[in-house]
Amino acid sequence: FNNNLLFESIKEIIGEKVSDEEIPDESNTDLVFNEQSNLPLVYIYNTHQTEEYINNEPTYDLKPTVYTAANYLKEVLERQGIKTIVEEANIKKYLDDNNLNYDDSYIASRYYLEQAKNNNPSLKLFIDLHRDALSHDAATVIYNNISYAKILFVVGADFNNYQKNLNFTESINKIVIDNYSFLTRGVLTKTGPLVNGVYNQDLSDNIILLEVGGNESTINEVANTLDLIGDVIVKKLGEENG
């Protein structure tokens, strides 16, 4: 993966000045997307914003989170001509301000998701980026001597028309299987009293919940995976536009 991209994401999040060093433009000029367009196509948010990964970059003394990963994926996509929004609002602050607790996080993310959806009708894909709670072995795959964080798609089945979300998610997972079969743990459907069962996916057919790695995954492994997920998203949006 591109270390420069990862470092730029991390420095942006902690408020440091971004390096003036030129990062090579890796965008694909043959894409069907209009790279001059300012209309966003992808919205990335983190319902559980503080979920952490392991920092194996000693240069930076910080704990990377799923929010770090969201910003990295944004950079990957924008270098492919896909304008992307990452939700910057503080989920914990929303919970505190509204006397809610961590279990109510989907109420908070729903508020910002609805705002983004209403304010940006051009959006084609909504990604709630999480990480799982897994051992490093269970969350990791090595392919061609590169270590990747495995992914899992989650679909809630406790609302009407969830099948549309399931079909959409399975179509993305199929692209992963066709191109990077080693990466995916599949699509998990959740329902019942002990789970959320909706995950705000009732707001759009094009909302996916993506688990990238686990609590023992390194941010480098996550970045390696997101490089490939960026390609998957390019292919999916290309199908939609085609």
Where does each model-flagged region fall?
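Catalytic-core regions of hydrolytic enzymes
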Residues: 57-140
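Active-site-adjacent mobile loop/cap segments within catalytic or ligand-binding domains
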Residues: 186-242
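Soluble periplasmic/extracytoplasmic beta-strand elements of cell-envelope proteins
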Residues: 41-46, 125-130, 152-154, 207-211
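Active-site-adjacent substrate-binding region
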Residues: 165-190
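Solvent-exposed loop/turn segments at secondary-structure junctions
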Residues: 49-52, 90-94, 131-136, 158-161, ...
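Second-shell loop/turn segments in exported
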Residues: 53-64, 73, 95-104, 154-163, ...
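Non-catalytic propeptide/linker segments at domain boundaries
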Residues: 1-46, 53-55
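A short, glycine/acidic-enriched catalytic loop
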Residues: 135-164
